[in-house]
């Protein structure tokens, strides 16, 4: 029999339900979590035994949105869901980051978390629901996991923090922050903000962590009622004698190697030391495992770097804790791009471009939460050559998608609205060298490239990555961390913003016990670093260029009567197609009558504007126009009078005498003066050649052939 166990609790303005025991009973654990009609089904499967020779923790997190959750059928030929979207990839990373550090050291059994969105309320984002579900499922599973975690979204509306704001509330919020953590400590922060202060950001993190305690309490209560027995897993016993022998051979040599400031030289020397140490030990005892020796050497490396930092000694590359690496900033480095910059910080370098397009270049995104159009695109590429390696080149990986999204958040707060700057903007960051914080280099490069392109950004923005080394109560916060310091440290803390405040904050903590004081120190130290970088950037370019690139399309905006839109478009789009071909421009028309003409040549744009004005001009009764015969019928002729307008000249209005045959007087393509007699309710125009020639005698009236006149 199915015996579901359910927990219900109020979480901010929403009701959350946790249910287990109903579905997927062959999985290690399964939970259905719902928050006001948004429901996510989360399963966990863990392997009881690790694969032989496994030397890393194979945790996989899959997040998938089913279109039936929103009452939709997928598009595409096959009408079913395909590869994960960018949004799904970002949420999978959001779930992964706070749970990964909570598995014990040495646990290498394969674990897979699958979160499936099965129902969605457009006002409640599934990401927080999925994070709660993953935490609950892992806690119920019995797998060694030092959770549970809670998760919360924090908004900032009318100077007040708001817990789990709805999608509608987020539109007026100056902050969108997701925080996850255990009962004791914050583990992850992901946010974008409208240039808030350090204190406001820290307050949001603390608020979110306090509010999510109710989630942790309810998961713990559910585990007491329905949790599986904890696995009897023990880490492998530490071979103290072997550790001591490896340390004796390698520790002092590794300590010397980590005084080499050049990354490639240091890596080469470290590789030599490791290879020689392993070779020596295996020669002494053939039963030793090279992978195990590699892990011991890695632990020694970590200890060497950390102990030096904690002792106040210079860092790996010789810097003090709050020193930024040398900066080189250049703009306009690529001649034909609309905007470009090369930003170099030590051994990290980003070549960033900005491209301007029209509204039709914007990305149409069809999500479960509804359709939207994105007119600011940010793409981050991390080729293998940036770290001196070979590798696959192809579609972006999870890391590239995540870093691109973070960099975009860093710049978003200073971007103009589509009304202020009616262009689609695409920024691409090519990481050409990498040794720490390429995403923050992308923020700096993007700010420079946008200014170089003439995009009216509100301010320059810069980003910096901070690190942390902590042992007991002793801690050191590091500015502008290297790749090694990120890997061997306890925290990765990225902050982007302008001189006025923070635009993006991302934090990943690998240990418990990060206090509010440590976060405060890190934020303040990051501010000093950010202002230093902005000072250097401003020497290269301190304001957006006054004009956009000569190679960028110039968008001219005019307004027409919405009733005239159909005239500009024409039947089946015939008029607008002809206009774009004739003028060499791109023309977009909005429902309110706003017309945007994009052209790289100003004369072409003016030509298009004149033609549109002709088409939309009101026909004046009694006015004389120059027309061209477009069609001849038995009862008269149709004459085009410019602007796509056409009227009928009845046979009785061709000449001041009786006309038997229209073709005796008019030919196709013939230019004639016409007077507007009437425009009826349906917009049909009556014209007269006879009255036009009477009014303007200089205009020759059409005559019958000479033979006819002589009769």
From Swiss-Prot:
Subcellular location as annotated: Cytoplasm
Residues in KH domain copies: 553-612
Gene3D superfamilies: GHMP Kinase, N-terminal domain, K Homology domain, type 1, Nucleic acid-binding proteins
EC main group: transferase
Compositional bias per record (Low complexity), positions renumbered to this chain: 694-711
Keyword Ribonucleoprotein: no
Cofactor needs: Mg(2+)
Domain of life of the source: Bacteria
Database matches in InterPro entries: ExoRNase_PH_dom1 (IPR001247), ExoRNase_PH_dom2 (IPR015847), ExoRNase_PH_dom2_sf (IPR036345), KH_dom (IPR004087), KH_dom_type_1 (IPR004088), KH_dom_type_1_sf (IPR036612), NA-bd_OB-fold (IPR012340), PNPase (IPR012162)
One GO term (biological process): mRNA catabolic process
GO molecular function: 3'-5'-RNA exonuclease activity; magnesium ion binding; polyribonucleotide nucleotidyltransferase activity; RNA binding
Alphabetic keyword roster: Cytoplasm, Magnesium, Metal-binding, Nucleotidyltransferase, RNA-binding, Transferase
Segments of this protein annotated with the region Disordered: 689-711
First and last residue of the signal peptide: none
Catalyzed reactions: RNA(n+1) + phosphate = RNA(n) + a ribonucleoside 5'-diphosphate
Main location per the UniProt record: cytoplasm
Sites where the protein binds Mg(2+): 486, 492
GO CC annotation: cytosol
Family statement drawn from the similarity comment of this UniProt entry: Belongs to the polyribonucleotide nucleotidyltransferase family.
Function per UniProt: Involved in mRNA degradation. Catalyzes the phosphorolysis of single-stranded polyribonucleotides processively in the 3'- to 5'-direction.
Subunit details: Component of the RNA degradosome, which is a multiprotein complex involved in RNA processing and mRNA degradation.
Protein name as annotated: Polyribonucleotide nucleotidyltransferase
Annotated organism of origin: Klebsiella pneumoniae subsp. pneumoniae (strain ATCC 700721 / MGH 78578)
Encoding gene per record: pnp
């Amino acid at each position: 029999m199915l015996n579901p166990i359910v927990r219900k609790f109020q979480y901010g303005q929403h009701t959350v339900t946790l249910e287990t025991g109903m579905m997927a009973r062959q999985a290690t654990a399964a939970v259905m979590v719902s928050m006001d009609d948004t429901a996510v089904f989360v399963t966990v499967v863990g392997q009881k035994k690790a694969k032989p020779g496994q030397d890393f923790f194979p945790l996989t997190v899959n997040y998938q949105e089913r279109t039936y959750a929103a009452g939709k059928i997928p598009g595409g030929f096959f009408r079913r869901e395909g590869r994960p979207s960018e949004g799904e990839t970002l949420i999978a990373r959001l779930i992964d980051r706070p749970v990964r550090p909570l598995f014990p050291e040495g646990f290498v059994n394969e674990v897979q978390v699958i979160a499936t969105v099965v129902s969605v309320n457009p006002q409640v984002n599934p990401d927080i629901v999925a994070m709660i579900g993953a935490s609950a499922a892992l806690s119920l599973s019995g797998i060694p996991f030092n959770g549970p975690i809670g998760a919360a979204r924090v908004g900032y509306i009318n100077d007040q923090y708001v817990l789990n704001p709805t999608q509608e509330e987020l539109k007026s919020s100056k902050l969108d922050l997701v925080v996850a953590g255990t009962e004791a400590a914050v583990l992850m922060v992901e946010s974008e903000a409208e240039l808030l202060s350090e204190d406001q950001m820290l307050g949001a993190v603390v608020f979110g962590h306090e509010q999510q305690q109710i989630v942790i309490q309810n998961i713990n209560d559910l585990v007491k009622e329905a949790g599986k027995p904890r696995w009897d897993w023990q880490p492998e016993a530490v071979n103290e004698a072997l550790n001591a022998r490896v340390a004796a051979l390698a520790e002092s040599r590794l300590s010397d190697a980590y005084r080499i400031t050049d990354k490639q030289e240091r890596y080469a020397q470290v590789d030599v030391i490791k290879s020689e140490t392993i070779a020596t030990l295996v020669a002494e005892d053939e039963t030793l495992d090279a992978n195990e020796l590699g892990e011991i050497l890695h632990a020694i490396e970590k200890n060497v770097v950390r102990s030096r930092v904690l002792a106040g000694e210079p860092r790996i590359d010789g810097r003090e804790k709050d020193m930024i690496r040398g900066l080189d900033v250049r703009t306009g480095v690529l001649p034909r791009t609309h905007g470009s910059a090369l930003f170099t910080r030590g051994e990290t370098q980003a070549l960033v471009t900005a491209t301007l397009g029209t509204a039709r270049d914007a990305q149409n995104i069809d999500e479960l939460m509804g359709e939207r159009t994105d007119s600011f695109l940010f793409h981050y590429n991390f080729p293998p050559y940036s770290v001196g390696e070979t590798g696959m080149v192809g579609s972006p990986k999870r890391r590239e998608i995540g870093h691109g999204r973070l960099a975009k958040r860093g710049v978003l707060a200073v971007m103009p609205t589509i009304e202020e700057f009616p262009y689609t903007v695409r920024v691409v960051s090519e990481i050409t060298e990498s040794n720490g914080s390429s995403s923050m280099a992308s923020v700096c490069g993007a700010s420079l490239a946008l200014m170089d392109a003439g995009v009216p950004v509100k301010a320059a923005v810069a980003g910096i990555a901070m690190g942390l080394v902590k042992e007991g109560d002793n801690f050191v916060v590091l500015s502008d961390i290297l790749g090694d310091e990120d890997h061997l440290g306890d925290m990765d803390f990225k902050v982007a913003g302008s001189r006025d405040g923070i635009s993006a904050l991302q934090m990943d903590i690998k240990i418990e016990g990060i206090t509010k004081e440590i976060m405060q120190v890190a934020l303040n130290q990051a501010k000093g670093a950010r202002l230093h970088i902005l000072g250097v950037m401003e020497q290269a370019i301190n304001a957006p260029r006054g004009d956009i690139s000569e190679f960028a399309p110039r968008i001219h905006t005019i307004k027409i009567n919405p009733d005239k839109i159909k005239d500009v478009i024409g039947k089946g789009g015939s008029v607008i197609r002809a206009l774009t071909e004739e003028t060499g421009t791109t023309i977009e028309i909005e429902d309110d009558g706003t017309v945007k003409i994009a052209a790289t040549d100003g004369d072409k744009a003016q030509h298009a504007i004149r033609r549109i004005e002709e088409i939309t001009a009101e026909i004046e009764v009694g006015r004389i126009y120059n027309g061209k015969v477009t069609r001849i019928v038995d009862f008269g002729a149709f004459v085009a009078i410019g602007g796509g307008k056409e009227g009928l000249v009845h046979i009785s209005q061709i000449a001041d005498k009786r006309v038997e045959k229209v073709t005796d007087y008019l030919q196709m393509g013939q230019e004639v003066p016409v007077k507007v007699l009437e425009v009826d309710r349906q917009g049909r125009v009556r014209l007269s050649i006879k009255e036009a020639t009477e009014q303007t005698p200089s205009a020759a009236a059409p005559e019958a052939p000479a033979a006819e006149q002589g009769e």
